[in-house]
């Protein structure tokens, strides 16, 4: 039986003339048909030729190639996004591998630092502390009524760059761009938000161009009351929203997640998304080596909320593979700037306290140091996996990597800190120091390493493999919460798509060109698990798949028809 592609239904539009051309979600530019130009008062406002979206995308690609710096390319793409969103996503879809590092990490870091300097047009919602009592009115000002995904930041811990104030808005904008480009979530359903609670970045406070609230950051009870007002206003406006916390400081990230994950459908991508993609990568790497994650010893450099979130997800996975909780925790070693986390270390945060090693178990270690450094830990633990989430460059030294390789023939080394300027070690150095034997995955994109005439592909342990699929799965299933089991199902699905596992060679993670396929598969796994967990209404597998297909937006123009307001 011959299949036919179902034609998208026409959209009925009340806007016309220049107003329509200024509406990024609806603007087609030179692709408005002759009939649409006549019906929507556009005749004479556009050049004569009616173009297809592919013709527009080809021109945009040529213009893009004319820019020499990554930040200029970023600014150009953001301008298209703020002019014609459908064209923006078609262009990004056509050149995803080239453009993902430009619209998000690492280039978005520079865009956040220069936000007030390169600002051109409003996008998203800025809620400042002085406006805290007007939140309901502010959210009513959002023109898109059917918002389904919000990414919110307070700008305090932007990548590895620290406090960027309202410049942090670049992160929600970039993140939501990937929800659409990778996960097929319509841009009409997305909303970036920055909570402007001031900044402690003196450079910003002294900058005459800075556009945020010029005030030191509010903290403690005032801060949490402000965030709570925001959460309650969001629940009132969009009760079924998916809320993603993004780049909150360590002292606030885990408390906010703990407080709200059972009150509103929410997750923290820095903690849970990073953990899910890292665990998926490690499952795949372990299987490719003919073993399980539960058989590995793992050392972390960085014991903040992200590092501890990854560690807890690893522990949960190794328990699924058969370890007891105590045995699983004994395989994970957390090192921060004060050394190895132990049960005698004072002033640990609650989420760190669960990840300490008992000093009684360390008495046989070969060291004379009271503070156990990363080198001490690597020398005594003899780990199979080394993960960096420190945000500090160069901490995986040659001595440390060579010491690890001395005891592990095929070490897995994951310097995950963003942006590239903060990476713990470069893939080039790791490959050289391990004589080509390391499997390397990074947080930011790196080119393949060539060493002794052999090419070593470098996997990017990018959260974009995970969060777009989670978002699509939540929307398609109608899930009311995001459970740990849903995140673990996302990790398992990602591992199943590993070329290294499936083909015995290649990258440990799928190619970016296949990311929409991966996102769909993760969406199905997440939606199915949501149903099993009782946080979504149970349906057949066919109905869930159909819901995913129905919610997967494609960057294609639809026919417009005129209607009154």
From Swiss-Prot:
This enzyme's EC code(s): 1.1.1.38
Cofactor(s) the protein needs: Mg(2+); Mn(2+)
Cofactor mode of binding and number, as noted: Divalent metal cations. Prefers magnesium or manganese.
Keywords for the protein's UniProt record, in alphabetical order: Metal-binding, NAD, Oxidoreductase
Catalytic site: 104, 175
Reactions catalysed: (S)-malate + NAD(+) = pyruvate + CO2 + NADH; oxaloacetate + H(+) = pyruvate + CO2
Top-level taxon of origin: Bacteria
Pfam families membership: malic (PF00390), Malic_M (PF03949)
Record has Signal as a keyword: no
Protein residues bound to NAD(+): 157, 270, 418
HAMAP family, A to Z: NAD_malic_enz
Descriptive protein name: NAD-dependent malic enzyme
Taxonomic lineage: Bacteria, Pseudomonadati, Pseudomonadota, Gammaproteobacteria, Enterobacterales
Recorded name of the encoding gene: maeA
């Amino acid at each position: 039986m011959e299949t036919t592609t179902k034609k998208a239904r026409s959209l009925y539009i009340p806007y016309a003339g220049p107003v329509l051309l200024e509406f990024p979600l609806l603007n087609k530019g030179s692709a408005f048909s002759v009939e649409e130009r006549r019906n929507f008062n556009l005749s004479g406002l556009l050049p004569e030729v009616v173009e297809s979206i592919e013709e527009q995308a080809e021109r945009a690609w040529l213009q893009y190639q004319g820019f020499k710096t990554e930040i200029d390319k970023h600014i150009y793409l953001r301008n298209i996004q703020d002019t014609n969103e459908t064209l923006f996503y078609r262009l990004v879809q056509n050149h995803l591998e080239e453009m993902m590092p430009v619209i998000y990490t690492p280039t978005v870091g520079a865009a956040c630092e220069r936000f007030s300097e390169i600002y051109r047009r409003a996008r998203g919602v800025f809620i400042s502390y002085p406006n805290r009592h007007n939140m309901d009115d502010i959210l009513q000002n959002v023109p898109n009524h059917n918002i389904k995904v919000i990414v919110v930041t307070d700008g305090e811990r932007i990548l590895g760059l620290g406090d960027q104030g309202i410049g942090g808005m670049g992160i929600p904008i970039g993140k939501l761009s990937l929800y659409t480009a990778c996960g097929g979530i319509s841009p009409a359903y997305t909303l970036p938000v920055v909570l402007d609670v001031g900044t402690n970045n003196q450079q910003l406070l002294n900058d005459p161009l800075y556009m945020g609230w010029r005030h030191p950051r509010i903290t403690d009870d005032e801060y949490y009351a402000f965030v709570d007002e925001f959460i309650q206003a969001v629940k009132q406006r969009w009760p079924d929203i998916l809320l993603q916390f993004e780049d909150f400081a360590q002292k606030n990230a885990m408390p906010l997640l703990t407080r709200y994950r059972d009150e509103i459908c929410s997750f923290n991508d820095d903690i849970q998304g990073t953990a899910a993609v890292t665990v998926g990568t490690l499952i795949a790497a372990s299987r490719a080596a003919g073993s399980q994650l539960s058989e590995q010893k793992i050392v972390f450099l960085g014991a903040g909320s992200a590092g501890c979130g990854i560690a807890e997800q690893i522990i949960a996975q190794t328990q699924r593979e058969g370890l007891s909780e105590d045995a699983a925790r004994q395989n994970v070693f957390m090192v921060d700037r004060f050394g190895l986390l132990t049960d005698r270390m004072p002033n640990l945060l609650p989420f760190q306290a669960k990840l300490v090693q008992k000093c009684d178990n360390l008495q046989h270690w070969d060291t004379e140091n009271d503070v156990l450094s990363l080198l001490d830990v690597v020398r005594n633990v003899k780990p199979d996996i080394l993960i960096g989430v420190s945000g500090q460059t160069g901490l995986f030294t040659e001595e440390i990597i060579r010491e690890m390789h001395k005891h592990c023939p095929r070490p897995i080394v994951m310097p995950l800190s963003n942006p590239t300027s903060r990476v713990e070690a470069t893939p080039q150095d790791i490959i050289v120091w391990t004589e080509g034997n390391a499997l390397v995955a990074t947080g930011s994109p790196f080119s393949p390493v060539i060493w002794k005439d052999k090419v070593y592909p470098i996997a990017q342990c990018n959260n974009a493999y995970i969060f777009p699929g989670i978002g699509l799965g939540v929307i398609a299933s109608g899930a009311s919460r995001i459970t740990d089991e849903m995140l673990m199902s996302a990790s398992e699905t990602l591992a199943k798509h590993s070329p290294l596992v499936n083909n015995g060679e290649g990258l440990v993670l799928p190619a970016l060109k296949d990311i929409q396929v991966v996102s769909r598969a993760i969406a199905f796994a997440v939606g199915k698990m949501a149903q099993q967990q009782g946080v979504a209404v149970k349906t057949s597998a066919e109905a869930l798949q159909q819901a995913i297909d129905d919610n997967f937006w494609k960057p294609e123009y639809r026919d417009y028809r005129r209607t009154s307001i």
